[in-house]
Amino acid sequence: MGGSILLGIFWHFVGATSAACFYAPMKKVTNWSWETMWAIAGIFSWILLPWGISYWLLPDFGSYYSFFGSDILLPVFLFGAMWGIGNIGYGLTMRYLGMSMGIGIAIGITLIVGTLMTPIIQGRFGELLASTGGQMTLIGVVIAVVGVAVVSYAGLLKEKAIGVTAEEFNLKKGLALAVMCGIFSAGMSFAMSAATPMHEEAARLGVDPLYVALPSYVVIMGGGAIINLGFCIIRLITRPELSFKADMSVVKGLLISNILFSALGGIMWYFQFFFYAWGHANIPANYGFMSWMLHMSFYVLCGGIVGLLLHEWKDTGKKPTRVLCIGCLIIVLAANIVGLGMAN
């Protein structure tokens, strides 16, 4: 396995670790509605950081974006909005199916759709099936889905052991949302593929290869921001039990800490895709679609590891923990098989 591919896999792991941890500081937020917290975090993750970092990277911020026509910018933006819809659906999936079943179905679907649809649309799927390297990467994708399923099963065992159930369990509604969420969440993978001309132009302007994908986040995350912030604002306006004014009226010390914890969560959320860009830059161009598989499978892996480190599995018994470890090892195996396939 080449050093560049190993480095790419490593950076995807770092990004997934940030993704698995971003909600931890947001759990410290108190006496605020979820909508206010999510909106404040989103301002940092979807607007301030993408714009600020891109302004710093690009020699001429305005001329870079004006260089592209709507034929490039609109698909990138719409795929970002598509991902934003999936992001909202993810939370609703947890409500109706519970964490484990919801994550297992939604992540499994988005891993498959986001990874395989790109080569299918590009007409390259047959080429993958015909080559040894392509066959190995596809086997790795299948094994990764198995790993996600095993980790999700471990979570189901954990929930049963500690008596946790879904907030409003509804199998029919939950499955429909999980499928929708899985498909729409893959919009980020499609957006990255559609933004390839933006990456190439950034490289032409002298942006370091590790950073060439970051300017496209202004457009991608702009699409996601409109959906997510719009959702939060509409709920804050229309739901009588929610009040942005009341959230902003808490005592000064709590207000500052809530803003800081929300901002920290948003910053950590952004850095999952900051390092995604680094990982993507080290993956061979003809296997760029595998970045999504690595990110999503590592996200599940890191979520399991973080849970173990935080002793969330301490009182669940040996079986759930054992199944979790097996699932994590399967995901590690999948990543190695994909890496070997890309190097073949």
Curated annotation (Swiss-Prot):
* Annotated keywords: Cell inner membrane, Cell membrane, Membrane, Sugar transport, Symport, Transmembrane, Transmembrane helix, Transport
One Pfam family assigned to this protein is RhaT
Q: Is Metal-binding among the key words of this record?
A: no
In the bilayer, the protein is annotated as:
Multi-pass membrane protein
Q: Which InterPro entries match?
A: L-rhamnose-proton_sym_RhaT
* Recorded catalytic activity of this chain's protein: L-rhamnopyranose(in) + H(+)(in) = L-rhamnopyranose(out) + H(+)(out)
Q: Which residues cross the membrane?
A: 5-25, 38-58, 72-92, 101-121, 137-157, 175-195, 214-234, 259-279, 289-309, 323-343
Taken from the UniProt entry, a GO cellular component term is: plasma membrane
Going by the entry's taxonomy, the superkingdom of the source organism is recorded as: Bacteria
Q: What is its main location?
A: membrane
The GO terms describing molecular function are: rhamnose transmembrane transporter activity; symporter activity
Q: Where in the cell is it found?
A: Cell inner membrane
As for family, the record states: Belongs to the L-rhamnose transporter (TC 2.A.7.6) family.
Purpose = Uptake of L-rhamnose across the cytoplasmic membrane with the concomitant transport of protons into the cell (symport system).
Q: Which NCBIfam families match?
A: PRK13499.1-1, PRK13499.1-3
Q: HAMAP family from the entry?
A: RhaT (MF_01532)
- Full protein name: L-rhamnose-proton symporter
| Organism, scientific name | Mannheimia succiniciproducens (strain KCTC 0769BP / MBEL55E)
